[in-house]
Regions:
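N-terminal acidic, glycine/proline-rich low-complexity segments
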Residues: 1-230
Length: 230
């Protein structure tokens, strides 16, 4: 999540909060110089003595890699806008349930409870407007059909970093929103006035971020029809 509120803490999305070091290390592989955004190495697991934990324990990446990793992220800014709403689900499932579909009975059994749980956590939506956000399905859809369908928009080469050690900001996606001019020197390291090495053109991550899809209003219905072959 880059703009709106997150689902686990005010700043930490579930996956980046659960293992911020893993996320930060993967994102670092998108950088032309991964060492510029590598997080500090965490201590050995609790109770482990020096030399007991499996070596190498989160060893440093090489200074240079054969190529940069291509990562396209789908933050909650985009995934939370793709929903299956309770009313749409019920209307779509009525004839399928009437046909005796075991799959429809199974999914309805747990999705009805899920809709109820989501409704209990919300203060502004209820009834048929309660929606389930399609985080993982949207990513799968992108991988399956991106090459053959217009409407996707991905911002490329964004320097998005993951906070790994903040007391209140663990798992936060950090971006530089300042209007500072990039440094023109060839120095990759930090310099006075550039704490964090945000201004070097040779430092930082290069992450793709999805900001638009061809199915913001239709994906939920499309997913149901594909799953139940309607």
């Amino acid at each position: 999540m880059l703009i709106s509120c997150d689902q686990i803490t005010p700043e930490g999305e579930f996956n980046t909060f659960a293992d911020p070091v893993a996320a930060a290390r993967v994102y670092a592989l998108t950088s032309p110089n991964p060492f510029t955004t590598m997080p500090p190495t965490p201590p050995a697991p609790p109770g482990a003595k020096e030399g007991e934990h499996p070596p190498p324990y989160l060893a440093s990446y090489p200074q240079k890699l054969s190529r940069q990793l291509k990562v396209t992220m789908f933050p909650l800014d985009i995934t939370e806008r793709h929903l299956i709403k309770r009313g749409e689900y019920r209307k779509t499932m009525e004839p399928v349930l009437a046909s005796g579909s075991p799959l429809a009975e199974w999914t309805t059994a747990f999705l009805n409870a899920t809709f109820d749980k989501v409704e209990s956590l919300q203060s502004k939506v209820s009834g048929d407007e309660v929606g389930l956000q399609l985080h993982d399905p949207l990513c799968v859809w992108y991988c399956m059909i991106k090459a053959g369908e217009a409407g996707w928009k991905v911002n490329v080469d964004e320097d998005i970093r993951i906070e790994t050690s903040g007391q209140w900001t663990r798992g936060m996606c950090v971006v530089d929103r300042r209007s500072r001019r990039k440094r023109e020197d060839d120095d990759v390291g930090e310099r006075a006035g550039d704490s964090g090495n945000w201004l070097s053109s040779k430092a930082g991550n290069r992450v793709g971020r999805c900001v638009a899809t061809p199915g913001e209003r239709s994906f939920g219905g499309y997913l149901l029809k594909r799953v139940f072959q309607l």
